[in-house]
């Protein structure tokens, strides 16, 4: 609508009243918007639900609040509002009153006024951020159903929805960044909602969303400075102790000087240099000065280790670090050491990176501190600033997160069970985080707000639990029914039974009531008289209760909606023996779920004996012994009968006798039934790393058990010793003593020595020697001291305490923090400071504080035991994976000293015992030994390194000359001198190829290229050097006149610029003007004065296409008036005698690109639009290119480069992306046909055997018969051969299928549309392949300008095509074409020189060849596409040079067309294959018919890229891109896809297609796994292609996704298979035996050879080529002895490479052929054949034509091919 409006507003011919009405409407809307904004600034006082629906609400008519906050008639004053309980709750005062809607409305009204008016008294109490956050806090504290009463709730919700729509598609990094910088609480809440929503649906959006959400919920933006208070407090205490409280004040100054060592420190700082070596020297000197070198090295080691553990998960790490450092302001300081110290101090105090903004705020406060009073005031303001950054931001952040989570608790948002589970987990994490803040003393003033937030999250957690329970299977309860006469005591017995089943009070359900809000969900449920009402469907109710499916109860109260039935035991009573009739449809389901107990009592006998008298109390017993409980059998519908399984005769099966029980046994039976009903098979636990098995003989079990117990006592270990597989609960690992036959799912160790004397070895602390096991120190430490989880012990037993390794007396917080670092990992050390602070200052809460700290801390795998002696008591901490802690208020003296870590001795890796140890453990021991060696020399190594750096300061440095003297030197290395020319070469090479080579690398590469090295880099360098040499004349002599006088210089006319490959930019992201498509076919249309009006496009033969409003009036083209103008709507055509050098093809279809290559989005539906030139029927489209007046007439093209529409209008500056395109329509401009064409578009379509085609005037039949005959030597045994001549048609008994049917079946796949890869993926890969080939193929290869020269480059043994019968050599006289052929060539060449596309037509035939017998029986033959000789000549002239350049570099590039497989080239292939990590050999089924036209067009564009872009090239390009037309049997079929086998340059185009397909599949697979591809794929892997044959050499990354790569190839329409055509997935193959081009590339005793398939060699002896015949089983009448002898000779040479055994078999066949065929040939011996082949392979003797042919099995080509 907006684009249409823009066209309407530009139209001059529309009615004035319509324009006036539009203007008035827009003005009215602006006035209403201004009035609405004014009203929104004067906020209303009421919480009116209708306000959102009106611009001016009719209900809100109260006056505004005065500026001073005084009261009005309806609204109390600000002073009165602050006294209400609602305001107190918002300010977190101690009140439990609920939020009153009226009070909230009043508070909101004053807050609105305070925001807009500075004089309002609320501004003196709170800042504006606090005012705006109050309502958000209130929203977070209320349940979601109660938020409608909060003022501005609907506006807040709408704002959050708008922010959600804006940010929902943004990446995670962007959202996290916005949270960190945004100050808008509504925006932050919306972003949190997006993150949490995608985290709940991480299955669709990625697991990183859920992981990041869990991590970020535990983090806060603000820095809590109270963690530094213990540090500052300890510093103050230490300073007080050294000064005021020092008993020897005179000794303080010398001690302080001796501690600081100021002279040495000053000398170190004065010698500091701001370089890498300078920092190393300075820091090393300071560490050595204060004797902290060793501990600093250990700390740096742990930091680097943790950094490299986390860097793999970091995203955009480089950009973040770069942004951090580039954001700092450069300061003019003489020594950067003090600047660094100030920055670190600011970070430690404020917790904020000292960027420019924070420094400015602090600086503004400190600048005013000129006196003592102003200094105190400034300090107070700084403290207030820091407090505001901490507390307020924490509460606001928690409120935003709570609102986001509560709004996600909605079935429409989180719909499936997985999302509910993740939402539940996120809510629990946030609940725990808020709970932690409630324990913080600094946050006590906000405690009530935090508890209300926790209450809101409790509601979310409860709701999520309900929703999970509804969707999950539950335990099936047990239902017992007590039946008997009234008054027998059933209800009392049910109550007594309920008490024995559970300590809880039973839940009671009354089925006579519709709603069950009173149901409590306890374990036992009693339903008394469940069948008393006939109106209740009690049978289905019972079936629903006793079921594994969740049962939702019908409740009336809102908070009980979704309540589930959860009881385990159901006890029901009934007076009816059979409540459900056996004939009921639900009887089977009912009686299967319940168990009946018939209740009888002594009261009945008393009533019968004494009717009319009251029953005495003596008839009732407290233990219910007066009751008789008879348990019926299963499915007994009465006492006598059981339900019939068939449901027919229910009184046919007698019931078993009942079982009599009492109340106690009945309760026990119910518990057993419940356990039996809910019994399930559990999967066996996999191999556990906390279970250790010691395997010994049965007689040694007891001894090993005693040894292990002795080890446990000796080392005070935490593991538990068990005999057998059963394990008991343990705080650590479990050691199992096993026999060899017992299975075990843990780590196994074989005990090789076991006796009582080994106990003495324990005194030497060598556990492995005592047991005789090969066990690493890591495993031993893990076994003995691993702790599961985190345990806090409030009570202490001295015999359970571990021996201390460290005893720390805590005098300051530094002592505690430094000791805790031994226990924690790097991330856990930051929590140690807060725990130390809590232990020191709040000793009464030691267990709670340490429990929380331990839950949040990750402990190292090393065993560490530390005893802390603190003022509040003693704390003992033991950690190893987990942790145990003992905390006491009193001091405890712990004896036992310091223990040593158990070791395995120095001989445990010697002997055969090490064979059972994995390599990882052996290497771990090696690294441990190297670590010990390093620990002994690390300090001295660092000091010596720093000393050598210090000494190198005074060493003279070599400096290069010329341009490398100063700042423009090489990137790496020193002392390399370059001349000016060499420097220019180095810079140009790096810029042209986008490399970062150092000077040394560049000189080495240039040297290797000059010496003729054949590696890829050297070849590409030579190609670049040649291109640069051609540009040597790009200089111009100029005269420069300046202050220095007159100088003569040479300046470069071409600017050096790196080529932007754009591998990481998709086609859809490209924009901006560039080179126009079909620029050689586009001309300018001018008026009589020569001014430009628009463009036209040459269609050929002097016919041009344009748009009507451009050629309207007097129009000229190239200075000549246009004529013969014809229009069809806005599209028009005209003629001109001025003919452009090229022509563009036109087609009716949807465009994909605009004239400059940008993508086009359009529905391509012509509609009338109003423009400045009147009504125009066209199609609306959008592109990213901005057009200008005068661009009308430019072409819009499709994927094949065909023009489908012309530009005719745009939306102007307001909507520049809107375009109006006139689609192409056919206009008959023909005068007389100048060339023959079989396919006539004017003829009607006909259906021919299922094909849509055009009927021709002449009929060319498909040739019949075959020239293949059985050899006279094999008339009897020719059936032993695996191949036979192809099917001959309907008369062939092997397959009666006609030749026409075979051709039709072969053409049908070509008529199916194949889409191929996505367009943007294909475009990117095409650019990569062009860049890769640019290193081998030169640019601007000249096309052939001579028609006869191009014709002689063709193979004259092939067909002339559909316009001339026979082969080319049939029309040759003395080596030159005859008149018929010359006339045809001349007519086509004339059109090609004008850039006009030629008819793309082929004549169809069937290949006469040997085929496998099974394919002969199926009637499968390969088609021959006979290309028009004129088209072939034009294509040879255009692209033969480019094709030869590509094939000449087959040794380096991916295309192997032109390779000789019987030459040393095969050795180069083998070396390429051997260097790959994974090798895949792939073949494709139906390759030709599955080719996408878009891929073929991209390959043809690659050929055109390297050509000289002449009209001949344009004609060939447009011809080959047009759909091929198959001509046969008097019809012409236009195919939709596929690549004709007879297309010119088919091998090269097929190979380029192959490369593009594989590159697209790899690119799409990588980016599907979130790997952005910014590099050239073809530079990272190698491949060899020849048509459909391919060998892919993948690195590990690509091989890991090979399944996805081949799946993508299949999705493109291809059919990849194994080389041997076997069924199964394509897997890596052995690189020592790779099949390529029907050759097996492998190593033989003679070297690397390409072995021809044995069956191909053997069938040479069975068949001979002769005259055409229908009886191929008869020998030919004549045999050419020369050709046949050469064929058999070559077969013997190929057979010699397979070994002597196979050669002997071939030799016998050769002797038999010579005898029966009368050949003058003596078959060579094995040694002779081997010698001849090796000589020809190495180029010693001339190769025969057969061997010299490249490609497939070449030795029979002259004999068997057509």
Curated annotation (Swiss-Prot):
O-(5'-phospho-RNA)-tyrosine: residues carrying this PTM: 983
Domain Peptidase C24: 1072-1228
Modified-residue entries (Phosphothreonine), positions: 1039
Record's keyword terms, sorted: ATP-binding, Covalent protein-RNA linkage, Eukaryotic host gene expression shutoff by virus, Eukaryotic host translation shutoff by virus, Host endoplasmic reticulum, Host gene expression shutoff by virus, Host membrane, Host-virus interaction, Hydrolase, Membrane, Nucleotide-binding, Nucleotidyltransferase, Phosphoprotein, Protease, RNA-directed RNA polymerase, Thiol protease, Transferase, Viral RNA replication
Cellular component GO terms held in the UniProt record: host cell endoplasmic reticulum membrane; membrane
Domain RdRp catalytic: 1477-1602
Site (Cleavage): 46-47, 331-332, 684-685, 959-960, 1070-1071
E.C. number(s) listed in UniProt: 3.6.1.15, 2.7.7.48, 3.4.22.66
Active site per UniProt: 1109, 1130, 1192
Single GO MF annotation: RNA-directed RNA polymerase activity
Any matching Pfam family: Peptidase_C24
BP term (GO), one: DNA-templated transcription
The protein, known as: Genome polyprotein
Protein's organism: Feline calicivirus (strain CFI/68 FIV)
SF3 helicase domain span: 458-614
Residue numbers carrying Phosphoserine: 1066
Residues annotated for ATP binding in this entry: 484-491
């Amino acid at each position: 609508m907006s684009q249409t409006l823009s066209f309407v507003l530009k139209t001059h011919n529309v009615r004035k009243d319509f324009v006036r009405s539009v203007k008035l409407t827009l003005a009215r809307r602006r006035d209403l918007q201004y009035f609405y904004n004014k009203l929104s600034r004067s906020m209303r006082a009421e919480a009116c639900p209708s306000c959102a629906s009106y611009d001016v609400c009719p209900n809100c008519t109260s006056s505004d609040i005065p500026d001073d906050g005084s009261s009005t008639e309806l609204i109390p004053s600000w002073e009165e509002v602050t006294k209400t309980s609602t305001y107190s709750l918002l300010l977190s005062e101690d009140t439990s009153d609920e939020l009153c809607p009226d009070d909230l409305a009043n508070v909101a009204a004053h807050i609105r006024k305070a925001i807009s008016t500075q004089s309002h008294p609320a501004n003196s109490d709170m800042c504006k951020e606090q005012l705006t956050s109050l309502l958000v806090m209130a929203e977070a504290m209320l349940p979601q159903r109660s938020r409608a009463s909060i003022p501005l709730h609907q506006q807040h919700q709408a704002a959050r929805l708008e922010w959600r729509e804006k940010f929902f598609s943004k990446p995670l990094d962007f959202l996290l960044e916005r949270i960190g910088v945004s100050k808008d609480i509504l925006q932050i809440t919306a972003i949190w909602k997006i993150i949490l929503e995608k985290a709940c649906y991480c299955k669709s959006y990625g697991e990183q969303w859920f992981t990041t959400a869990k991590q970020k919920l535990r983090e806060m933006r603000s820095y809590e400075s109270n963690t530094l208070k213990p540090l500052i407090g300890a510093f103050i205490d230490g300073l007080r102790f050294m000064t005021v409280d020092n008993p020897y004040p005179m000794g303080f100054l010398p001690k302080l000087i001796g501690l600081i060592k100021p002279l040495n420190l000053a000398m170190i700082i004065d010698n500091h240099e701001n370089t890498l070596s300078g920092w190393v020297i300075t820091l090393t000197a300071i560490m050595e000065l204060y004797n902290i070198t060793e501990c600093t090295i250990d700390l740096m080691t742990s930091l680097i280790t943790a950094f490299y553990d986390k860097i793999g998960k970091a995203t955009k790490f480089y950009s973040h670090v770069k942004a951090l450092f580039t954001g700092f302001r450069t300061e003019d300081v003489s020594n950067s050491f003090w600047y660094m110290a100030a920055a670190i101090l600011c970070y430690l105090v404020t917790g904020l990176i000292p960027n420019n903004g924070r420094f400015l705020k602090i600086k503004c406060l400190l600048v005013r501190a000129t006196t003592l009073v102003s200094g105190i005031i400034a300090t107070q303001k700084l403290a207030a600033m820091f407090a505001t950054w901490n507390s307020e931001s924490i509460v606001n952040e928690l409120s935003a997160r709570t609102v986001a989570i509560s709004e996600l608790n909605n079935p429409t948002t989180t719909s499936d069970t997985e999302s509910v589970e993740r939402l539940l987990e996120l809510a629990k994490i946030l609940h725990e985080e808020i709970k932690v803040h409630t324990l913080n003393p600094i946050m006590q003033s906000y405690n009530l707000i935090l508890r209300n937030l926790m209450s809101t999250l409790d509601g979310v957690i409860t709701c999520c639990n309900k929703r999970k329970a509804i969707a999950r299977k539950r335990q099936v309860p047990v239902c017992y029914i007590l039946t008997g006469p009234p008054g027998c005591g059933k209800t009392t017995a049910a109550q007594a039974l309920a008490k024995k089943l559970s300590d809880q009070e039973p839940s009671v359900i009354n089925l006579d009531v519709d709603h069950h809000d009173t149901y409590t969900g306890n374990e036992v449920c009693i339903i008394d008289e469940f069948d008393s009402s006939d109106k209740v469907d009690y049978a289905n109710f019972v079936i629903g209760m006793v079921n594994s499916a969740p049962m939702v109860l019908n409740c009336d109260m809102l908070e009980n909606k979704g309540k589930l039935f959860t009881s385990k035991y159901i006890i029901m009573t009934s007076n009816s023996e059979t409540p459900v009739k056996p004939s009921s449809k639900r009887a089977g389901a009912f009686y299967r779920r319940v168990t009946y107990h018939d209740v009888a009592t002594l009261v009945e006998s008393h009533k019968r004996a004494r009717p009319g008298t009251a029953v005495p109390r003596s008839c009732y017993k407290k233990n219910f012994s007066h009751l008789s409980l008879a348990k019926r059998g299963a499915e007994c519908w009465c006492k006598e009968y059981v339900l019939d399984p068939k449901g027919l005769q229910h009184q046919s099966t007698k019931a078993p006798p009942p079982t009599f029980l009492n109340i106690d046994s009945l309760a026990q039976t119910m518990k057993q039934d419940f356990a039996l009903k809910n019994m399930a098979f559990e999967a066996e636990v996999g191999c556990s790393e906390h279970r250790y098995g010691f395997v010994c003989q049965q007689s040694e079990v007891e001894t090993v058990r005693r040894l292990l117990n002795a080890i446990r006592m000796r080392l005070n270990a935490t593991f538990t010793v068990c005999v057998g597989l059963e394990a008991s609960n343990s705080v650590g690992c479990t050691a199992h003593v096993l026999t060899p036959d017992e299975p075990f799912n843990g780590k196994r160790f074989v005990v090789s020595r076991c006796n009582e004397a080994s106990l003495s070895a324990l005194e030497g602390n060598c556990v492995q020697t005592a047991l005789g096991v090969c066990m690493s120190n890591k495993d031993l430490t893990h076994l003995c001291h691993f702790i599961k989880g985190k345990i806090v012990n409030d009570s202490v037993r001295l015999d359970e305490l571990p021996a201390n390794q460290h005893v720390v007396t805590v005098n300051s917080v530094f002592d505690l923090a430094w000791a805790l670092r031994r226990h924690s990992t790097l991330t856990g050390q930051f929590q140690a400071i807060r725990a130390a602070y809590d232990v020191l200052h709040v000793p009464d809460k030691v267990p709670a504080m340490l429990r929380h700290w331990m839950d949040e801390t990750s402990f190292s795998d090393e065993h560490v035991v530390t005893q802390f002696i603190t003022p509040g008591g003693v704390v003992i901490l033991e950690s190893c994976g987990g942790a145990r802690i003992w905390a006491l208020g009193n001091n405890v003296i712990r004896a036992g000293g310091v223990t040593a870590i158990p070791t395995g001795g120095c001989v445990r890796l010697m002997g055969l015992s090490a064979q059972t140890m994995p390599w990882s453990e052996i290497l771990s021991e090696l690294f441990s030994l190297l670590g010990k060696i390093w620990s002994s020399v690390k300090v001295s190594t660092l000091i010596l390194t720093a000393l050598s750096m210090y000494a190198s300061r005074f060493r003279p440095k070599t400096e290069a000359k010329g341009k490398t003297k100063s700042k423009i030197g090489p990137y790496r290395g020193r002392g390399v001198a370059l001349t000016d020319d060499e420097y220019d070469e180095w810079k140009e090479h790096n810029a042209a190829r986008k490399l970062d080579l150092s000077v040394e690398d560049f000189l080495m590469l240039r040297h290797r290229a000059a010496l003729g090295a054949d590696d890829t880099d050297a070849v590409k360098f030579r190609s670049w050097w040649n291109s640069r040499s051609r540009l040597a004349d790009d200089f111009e002599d100029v005269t420069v006149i300046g202050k220095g006088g007159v100088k003569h210089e040479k300046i470069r006319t071409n600017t050096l610029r790196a080529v932007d490959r754009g591998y990481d930019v998709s086609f859809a992201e490209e924009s901006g003007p560039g080179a126009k498509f079909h620029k050689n076919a586009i001309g300018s249309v001018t008026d009589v004065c020569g001014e430009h009006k628009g463009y036209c496009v040459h269609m050929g033969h002097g016919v041009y296409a344009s748009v009507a409003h451009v050629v309207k009036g007097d129009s000229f083209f190239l200075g000549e008036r246009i004529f013969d103008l014809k229009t069809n709507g806005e599209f028009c055509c005209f003629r001109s005698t001025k003919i452009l050098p090229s022509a563009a093809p036109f087609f009716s279809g949807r465009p994909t690109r605009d004239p400059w290559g940008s993508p086009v989005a359009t529905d391509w539906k012509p509609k009338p639009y109003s423009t400045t030139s009147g009504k125009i029927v066209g199609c609306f489209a959008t592109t990213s290119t901005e057009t200008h007046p005068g661009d009308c007439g430019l072409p819009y093209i499709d994927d094949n480069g065909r023009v489908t529409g012309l530009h005719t209008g745009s939306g102007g500056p307001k909507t520049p992306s809107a375009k109006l395109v006139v689609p192409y329509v056919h206009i008959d401009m023909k005068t007389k046909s100048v060339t023959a064409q079989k396919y006539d578009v004017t003829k009607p379509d006909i259906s021919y055997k299922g094909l849509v085609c055009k009927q021709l005037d002449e009929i060319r039949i498909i040739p019949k018969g075959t020239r293949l005959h059985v050899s006279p030597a094999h008339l009897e045994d020719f059936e032993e051969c695996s191949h036979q001549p192809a099917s001959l048609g309907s008369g062939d008994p092997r397959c009666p299928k006609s030749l026409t049917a075979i051709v039709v079946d072969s053409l049908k796949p070509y008529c199916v549309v194949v889409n191929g890869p996505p367009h943007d993926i294909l475009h990117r890969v095409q650019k990569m392949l062009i860049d890769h080939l640019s290193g081998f193929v030169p640019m601007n290869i000249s096309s052939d300008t001579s028609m006869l020269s191009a014709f002689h480059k063709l193979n004259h043994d092939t067909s002339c095509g559909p316009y001339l019968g026979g082969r080319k050599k049939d029309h040759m006289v003395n080596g030159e074409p005859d008149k018929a052929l010359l006339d045809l060539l001349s007519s086509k060449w004339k059109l090609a020189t004008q850039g006009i596309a030629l008819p793309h037509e082929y004549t169809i035939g069937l290949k006469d060849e040997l085929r496998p017998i099974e394919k002969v029986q199926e009637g499968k033959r390969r088609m021959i596409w006979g290309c028009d000789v004129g088209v072939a000549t034009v294509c040879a002239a255009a692209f033969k040079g480019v094709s030869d350049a590509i094939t000449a570099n087959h040794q380096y590039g991916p295309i192997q067309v032109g390779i000789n497989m019987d030459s040393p080239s095969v050795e180069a292939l083998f070396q390429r294959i051997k260097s790959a990590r994974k090798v895949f050999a792939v073949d494709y089924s139906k390759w030709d018919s599955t080719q996408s036209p878009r891929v073929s067009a991209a390959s043809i564009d690659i050929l055109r890229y390297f050509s000289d872009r002449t009209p001949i090239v344009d004609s060939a390009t447009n011809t080959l891109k047009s759909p091929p037309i198959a001509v046969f049997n008097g019809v012409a079929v236009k195919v939709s896809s596929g690549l004709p086998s007879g297309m010119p340059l088919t091998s090269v185009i097929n190979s380029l297609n192959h490369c593009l397909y594989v590159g697209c599949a790899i690119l799409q697979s990588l980016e599907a796994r979130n790997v952005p591809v910014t590099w050239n794929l073809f530079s990272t892997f190698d491949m060899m292609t020849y048509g459909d044959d391919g060998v892919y050499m993948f690195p590990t990354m690509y091989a890991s996704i090979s399944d996805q790569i081949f799946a993508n190839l299949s999705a493109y329409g291809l059919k990849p298979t194994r080389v041997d055509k076997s069924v199964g997935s394509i897997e890596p193959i052995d690189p020592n035996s790779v099949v390529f081009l029907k050759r097996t590339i492998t190593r033989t005793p003679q070297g690397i050879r390409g072995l021809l398939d044995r069956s191909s060699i053997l069938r040479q002896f069975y068949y001979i080529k002769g005259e055409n015949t229908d009886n191929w089983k008869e020998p030919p009448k004549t045999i050419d002895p020369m050709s046949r002898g050469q064929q058999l000779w070559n077969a013997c040479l190929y057979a010699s490479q397979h070994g002597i055994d196979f050669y002997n078999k071939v030799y016998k066949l050769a002797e038999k052929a010579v005898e029966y065929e009368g050949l003058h040939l003596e078959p060579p011996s094995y040694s002779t054949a081997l010698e001849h082949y090796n000589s020809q392979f190495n180029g010693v003797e001339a190769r025969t034509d057969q061997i010299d042919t490249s490609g497939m099995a070449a030795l029979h080509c002259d004999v068997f091919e057509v």
